[in-house]
Amino acid sequence: MSKLISYAAKNTLRNTRLGANPICQHATRDYMHLAAASAARNTYSTPAVGFAKQPVLRQAVNTVAVMGQISRRSMFIQTQDTPNPESLKFLPGVDVLGKGNTYDFPSGSAAHCSPLAKLLFRVEGVRAVFFGGDFITISKEESGEWGLIKPEVFAVIMDFFASGLPVIHEARPNADTEILEDDDETVMMIKELLDTRIRPTVQEDGGDIVFMGYENGIVKLKMQGSCSSCPSSIVTLKNGVQNMLQFYIPEVESVEQVFDDADKMANKEFERFEKSLMQKESVNQPNAPVNIGGGTPN
C-alpha cells in the first residue's frame, strides 16, 4: 500500500503499454513427462504414480528422467508471506507465466486449461491457485496447515517444471486492460495506470487486480490471488489504489471492490464461522460475579 502511495507522488503516467507475449502452446504426453520428472527424484506425485510404474513405459520414463534430474538440480523454491495469512507465495526461480501475465484459479473447476493448477488442487487443503509472472500463490482452507501443505506443493512444482510442460495450454493476456475502440479517454488512462503502476505492485504481494468497469466516476475492481480474501484488501483499495487513480485522473471519485458469486459465498461462510466462534467464546467465559446485596461491589 505504501508503495502505491509513493508511486503516486513520484511518478508520471507512462504512455507505453506492456506487451503480452504468447505464454505457451498445447502440449502432449503430459503425464509421461511428469512421470519422468518424478522418476528423476525417486518420488512420485499422485498423477504420476500409476503412469510411471507401467512396465511398458518404464524404459521411456527412465530415458527422459535424466533430463528431469538436471532441471531439478537447478531449482530452488522460495516462499514469501503475503498480507493474507491464508495465502503463501511460492517463487520457483523460473518464469511461470512471464512478466505482466496472471491467471486466477478460484476453484479446481477453473483449472481445466492448466496441468500445473490441476495438480496443485489435488493437494489436500488447497482452496485456490494463482499464477503470476514468476510466482505461484496458494490459498489454503481455514482448517489446512502450511506444515502439511507446503511439502506437497514443493513436490508438485519441482516435478512439473522438471517435466518441461507448459503451465497453461492457451495464451491469455490481460484482457481486462486491453484498449477497446469504444473506450473513452478516462477509461484508457485507468487501464494504462492499472497495467503500468498498480498491477505490478499488487502482484508483489501474490495477487492481482482486475478492471471490471467505470461508471459515473466510480472504478470497479476485483481482487484476485492472495488479495481476494485479504483482511486489508479494502484498505489497499482505498488508501493505495484510489489515491493513485485520483492523483493522475481527477475524474475518478472512488473505487469499489466487486465480488462474484464465489467470493460472496466464501465471505458468507467466513462470517458464519466467525459468528460460531464468538458464540462458543461467550459460552466458555465465566459468569460475571453477582452482587446479591444490591450495593456497589468492592
From Swiss-Prot:
One Gene Ontology cellular component: mitochondrion
Region of interest called Disordered, as start-end residue ranges on this chain: 279-298
Entry keywords, A to Z: Iron, Iron-sulfur, Metal-binding, Mitochondrion, Transit peptide
Entry-linked Pfam families: Nfu_N, NifU
Purpose of the protein: Molecular scaffold for [Fe-S] cluster assembly of mitochondrial iron-sulfur proteins.
Family: Belongs to the NifU family.
UniProt name for this protein: NFU1 iron-sulfur cluster scaffold homolog, mitochondrial
Top-level taxonomy: Eukaryota, Metazoa, Ecdysozoa, Arthropoda, Hexapoda
